[in-house]
């Protein structure tokens, strides 16, 4: 399932995520198998881009890499771009972080 969520592109690795805001803490949840997205919980509210900034900062800490929101800046369903990691690296990190694996 995780291989369907993490994709390679010309620019780098894309990850499909589903964001829940106003959470108790920032964390990676489980894989939403129906939507084929990784659930991310963020403490910030989606006001004036605060949640998007928090997502980028949180994921930068996990992947130790630059993170960009590739699509979905105004949606809870987003795709993030990691330009300088391999798919294998990203999958390995996610498998450590995801609660349902």
Swiss-Prot record:
SUPFAM superfamilies (UniProt xref): YggU-like
A single GO CC term for this protein reads:
cytoplasm
Of which family is this protein a member? Belongs to the UPF0235 family.
What is the protein named? Answer: UPF0235 protein MmarC7_0309
